[in-house]
Amino acid sequence: MARYRHSRSRSRSRYRRRRRRRSRYRSRRRRYRGRRRRRSRRGRRRRGYSRRRYSRRRRRY
């Protein structure tokens, strides 16, 4: 029984880790895509503001 419980916890931790990594990658990809589009459209005017906002969001994630 002890062995079964150990394997179960191990699989659960592995699943959780994989899920977290995938979600983080997806969020990062979307953020980079949005930033690139905004920079090309607006230019250098709003660069500092966008950077500050993104840093705050990154900290939360």
Swiss-Prot record:
Subcellular locations according to the entry: Nucleus; Chromosome
Source superkingdom: Eukaryota
One Gene Ontology biological process: chromosome condensation
Sequence similarity: Belongs to the protamine P1 family.
Keyword Ligase recorded: no
Entry comment describing in which tissues the protein is expressed: Testis.
GO CC term (a single one): nucleosome
Gene Ontology MF terms: DNA binding
InterPro entries given in the database record: Protamine_P1
Disordered: region residues: 1-61
Entry keywords, A to Z: Chromosome, Developmental protein, Differentiation, DNA condensation, DNA-binding, Nucleosome core, Nucleus, Spermatogenesis
Native source species: Macropus giganteus
Task of the protein: Protamines substitute for histones in the chromatin of sperm during the haploid phase of spermatogenesis. They compact sperm DNA into a highly condensed, stable and inactive complex.
Protein name (record): Sperm protamine P1
Lineage: Eukaryota, Metazoa, Chordata, Craniata, Vertebrata
